[in-house]
């Protein structure tokens, strides 16, 4: 594999994602299925055509970025298996921000696998003080409840997950702190 070949595959995958029929938000999950794929090295895409979900194999467990929409849990589990990974190995989950379409499978992973949940400090505060901003009530058929965050991330934090070190930044915009990450 070369960077050029990998980038070509990435562009093809983006085309497939953009052409996929999305269905209606928060349901019709079967219309948003995207075949999971390896992005590069130990980084995988297991999300759907609406919400990105990524997995990093850290060598000491899986790190998952976001948890999809309400109703996406079965698809995420299947996609993880399809990549040759085990969902029970998801040790950590980082939420990009505190909206319901990014934490649909959190409660399942916490209950089943004791996955530790990480989120930016301002969104953790939002969960506590203004939970309606998570938009669960707007989801119609979503039965998910808010959950406890295990680790509140601050600006500039550097955390290690297995053999993967990540630098975090809090960027206001879509919410008070959309959480871009830099894998180092």
Say what each PLM segment does:
Residues 61-63, 92, 164:
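Structural motif
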Residues 36-38, 55-57, 155-184:
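Core dinuclear metal-dependent hydrolase active-site scaffold
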Residues 29-87, 180-183:
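Conserved beta-strand hairpin/beta-sheet module of binuclear metal-dependent hydrolase folds
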Residues 34-35, 45-46, 141-144, 148-150, ...:
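Short Gly/Pro-enriched turn/cap motifs at secondary-structure boundaries
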Residues 1-33:
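N-terminal pre-domain segments of enzymes
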Residues 43, 71-74, 81-160:
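Active-site HxH/HxHxD metal-binding segment of metal-dependent hydrolases
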């Amino acid at each position: 594999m070369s960077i050029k070949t990998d980038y070509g595959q990435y562009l093809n995958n983006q085309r497939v994602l953009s052409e996929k029929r999305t269905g209606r938000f928060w349901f019709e999950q079967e219309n948003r299925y995207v075949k999971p794929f390896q992005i590069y090295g130990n980084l995988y895409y297991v999300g759907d055509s609406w919400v990105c979900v990524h997995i990093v194999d850290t060598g000491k467990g899986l790190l998952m970025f976001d948890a999809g929409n309400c109703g996406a849990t079965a698809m995420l589990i299947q996609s993880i298996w399809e990549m040759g990974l085990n969902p029970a190995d998801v040790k950590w989950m980082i939420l990009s921000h505190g909206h319901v379409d990014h934490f649909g499978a959190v409660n399942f992973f916490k209950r089943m696998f004791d996955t530790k949940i990480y989120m930016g400090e301002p969104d953790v505060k939002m969960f506590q003080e203004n939970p309606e901003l998570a938009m669960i009530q707007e989801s119609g058929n979503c039965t998910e409840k808010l959950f406890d965050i295990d680790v509140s991330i601050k600006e500039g934090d550097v955390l290690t997950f297995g053999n993967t070190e990540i630098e975090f930044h809090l960027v206001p915009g879509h919410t008070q702190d959309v959480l871009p990450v830099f894998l180092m």
